[in-house]
Amino acid sequence: MSETARTTIDQSEVDRFSAMAAEWWDPTGKFRPLHKFNPVRLAYIRDKVCEQFGRDPKSPQPLKGLRLLDIGCGGGLLSEPMARMGADVLGADASEKNIGIARTHAAGSGVNVDYRAVTAEALAEAGESFDIVLNMEVVEHVADVDFFMTTCAHMVRPGGLMFVATINRTLKAAALAIFAAENVLRWLPRGTHQYEKLVRPEELEKPLEASGMQVTDRTGVFFNPLANQWNLSKDMDVNYMIVAKRPL
């Protein structure tokens, strides 16, 4: 297959999330797990960015002046907080419906985000570049993980960072993140995740490193039902996050 013919888009996944687009900002709706997940991933991103760029994480706008891409942004659950932290945010999603919801919510919230219904490969072909690229809960929904990671890596500026969050392909993840979350607890609609599309850390790190990126941190993330919140963990068997930087 030629490079120009490759695509990161799985249309069935785009259609699935488009059908739920109206619920993005409902903290009790189909995206409730992401609302719960937001505090821990926002803090993680902020702290790692501040560490890399020499910023004060306690500053009201620690990301001020940094250009950030939120790829697969959905309704903007990450894009808006990143913009509030001062980043110049481009929120990209393959779903026109998701982008419509994101634009409407941002307008009502007074947050400035450049939302575009566009693919990662289209942005890369246009020569876009960023200090920070977020791939959060996206890779398990794309058609070609290697191509997606390589494409996104090419948009990271020297000294910049890429964050990836996803679900590991393990039996433990199948039991907890798919069977329990979708069929028992009903946190997610059935069919949200398919086991064969889950991605192991090394399957993300290989194309990143081949693209000149250096993996600088890995962490697991787990849900504590007693505290009703997500926390960082050494256990990467289910949910995990990776940070990679492009050397100067």
From Swiss-Prot:
The lineage of its organism: Bacteria, Pseudomonadati, Pseudomonadota, Alphaproteobacteria, Hyphomicrobiales. GO terms for biological process: methylation. It is an enzyme of class 2 (transferase). It catalyses: a 3-demethylubiquinol + S-adenosyl-L-methionine = a ubiquinol + S-adenosyl-L-homocysteine + H(+); a 3-(all-trans-polyprenyl)benzene-1,2-diol + S-adenosyl-L-methionine = a 2-methoxy-6-(all-trans-polyprenyl)phenol + S-adenosyl-L-homocysteine + H(+). One of its GO terms (molecular function) is polyprenyldihydroxybenzoate methyltransferase activity. S-adenosyl-L-methionine binds at residues 41, 72, 93, 136. Keywords: Methyltransferase, S-adenosyl-L-methionine, Transferase, Ubiquinone biosynthesis. InterPro entries: SAM-dependent_MTases_sf, UbiG_MeTrfase. O-methyltransferase that catalyzes the 2 O-methylation steps in the ubiquinone biosynthetic pathway. It comes from the Bacteria. Belongs to the methyltransferase superfamily. UbiG/COQ3 family. This is Ubiquinone biosynthesis O-methyltransferase. SUPFAM superfamilies: S-adenosyl-L-methionine-dependent methyltransferases (SSF53335).
